[in-house]
Amino acid sequence: MSIDTKAIEKHIRGILIALGDDPDREGLKETPKRVAKMYEEVFKGMEYSNDDIAEMFNKTFEEDLKESEEDNIVLVKDIEIFSHCEHHLTLMYNMTVAVAYIPNKRLIGLSKIARIADMVSRRLQLQERIGKDIAEIMEKVTASKDIAVIIKGEHGCMTSRGIKKPGALTTTMTLKGRFKNDDSLVTKLMALYKA
């Protein structure tokens, strides 16, 4: 699926008219085109399924891990992303993502983890789904069932409208495999996360 920038331009022009403004006035003439171009960039992830993203970033390194390394956690944290809430199209911002996995013969390059988080966030999203999508893609790429994703962020639908509570943070956690059932692993994960 590709993003239809011409349709976006047309509809943004209609929104400007519906708001009671003149889309042909100076300052707004190029706005529909600028918004369409911005949407093409910030919603780039909508062009790809989770399978597509997994294929994009599937370069891994095969490692012969010893049994003593079975509980070694790889954690990449403080990955900054932004997204847009699918309910109000408002910005989800000041978002940080932490992705952890226990390697199972395949190691992924650390920058690929950040790229996966970035691509998944470039969709109309829910914070909970961002975590689920990242975990699903990580499982496909690394073949590890043991994945954890922690996300913190602010939501424009809470800070700029409705209840208007700036600074309210939403935290979500997606746990798969042993992270879901092994309290000692979760304790180890949280110690790494807070370090």
Curated annotation (Swiss-Prot):
Q: Where is the signal peptide?
A: none
Lineage: superkingdom:
Bacteria
- By its UniProt entry, which InterPro entries does this protein fall under? GTP-CH-I_C/QueF, GTP-CH-I_N, GTP_CycHdrlase_I, GTP_CycHdrlase_I_CS, GTP_CycHdrlase_I_dom
Q: Name one GO cellular component term.
A: cytoplasm
Pathway(s) the chain acts in: Cofactor biosynthesis; 7,8-dihydroneopterin triphosphate biosynthesis; 7,8-dihydroneopterin triphosphate from GTP: step 1/1
**According to the UniProt record, which cysteines are disulfide-bonded?**
none
For the keyword Hydrolase, the answer is: yes
Q: Which GO terms describe its biological process?
A: one-carbon metabolic process; tetrahydrobiopterin biosynthetic process; tetrahydrofolate biosynthetic process
Q: Name one GO molecular function term.
A: GTP cyclohydrolase I activity
> What does the record give as the reaction this protein catalyses?
GTP + H2O = 7,8-dihydroneopterin 3'-triphosphate + formate + H(+)
Q: Tell me any Pfam family this protein matches.
A: GTP_cyclohydroI
According to the UniProt entry, the coiled-coil residues are none
The EC number(s) attached to this protein equal 3.5.4.16
Q: Which UniProt keywords apply?
A: GTP-binding, Hydrolase, Metal-binding, Nucleotide-binding, One-carbon metabolism, Zinc
| Binding, Zn(2+) | 85, 88, 157
Keyword Acetylation attached = no
Broad class of enzyme this protein falls into: hydrolase
State how it assembles: Toroid-shaped homodecamer, composed of two pentamers of five dimers.
Give the NCBIfam families listed for this entry.
folE, PRK09347.1-2, PRK09347.1-3
Q: Which family does it belong to?
A: Belongs to the GTP cyclohydrolase I family.
Q: What name is this protein filed under?
A: GTP cyclohydrolase 1
Which gene produces this protein?
A: folE
